[in-house]
Amino acid sequence: MPAQIDIADARFAYDGEHEVLHGVNLQIEEGSYVVILGHNGSGKSTLARTMNALIVPDEGSVSACDLSSADPDEQIEIRRHVGMVFQNPDNQMVTSIVADDVAFGPENLGIAQSEIVRRVDEALEAVAMTEYAQADPTELSGGQKQRVSIAGMLAMNPDVLVFDEPCAMLDPRGRRGVRRVMRSLNERGMTIVHITHFMEDALDADVVHVMDKGNIVLSGTPDEVFAHGDLLRSLGLEQPFAMRLAHALRARGIDVTDTARLPELEEQICRLAGIDAEKGE
């Protein structure tokens, strides 16, 4: 199966001198859930912007949905297929009513009003924000605002959604809500690319790529990637809390196995203690 997004030897420098991307190669398959991890300055957000032609590499190539970002005539079409959700939802709010904000993109495409209404209704339902359709976006929580931003992208009917640090400004509850939306969209068949520095965000992924200094330095499933604790720490990243806790327990002689998922670790501990994890007794 050909890649839905194909990045080949991509190089890019903002000032024409200091490269941010150093020959990156990445293929993203249709319907996959991909997480790109990295500390600030690793190049992950720049890479994300190449996926919908907001940035065109100085060298190498990027194709999305069989369209080339190097062709100016195809760049707008790429952005219809590949939507982006950014870190600060306030920067994507353009009206004083939630439903109107979601409708803004389709209206600019000249779509018929009846179709816009249908898309807005479906998009708000997909992010569990239907009851806020007539609300003022400025009165919503950070997590709710981000879900409205996602709805605005969904109303454009993209094939791929790229999330660039969408949870960076949210509290844990808001982060969980946005992650639930991303999982739900992926379960419906949409390709999800999540750019993040939160380790727990990567647990939902099919594939995780770790970036450092403009290169992808590690790839694999979440469990495969998080098994490289020493490498992650050298890159300024940490293993998920559950895996760090498992290591600490083993150091104290408690026989648990590595897992990045807290519920799995809780089940192991309960089993060792002779406790029914579901009943708590």
Which role does the model predict for each range below?
Residues 37-39:
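The feature captures the beta-strand-to-loop junction immediately N-terminal to the Walker
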Residues 52:
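Helix-to-loop junction immediately C-terminal to a conserved catalytic motif
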Residues 60-70, 78:
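Conserved ABC transporter NBD signature motif
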Residues 114-132:
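Conserved ABC ATPase "signature" region
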Residues 136-140, 144:
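Conserved ABC ATPase signature
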Residues 161-164:
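Catalytic Walker B motif of ABC-type/P-loop ATPase nucleotide-binding domains
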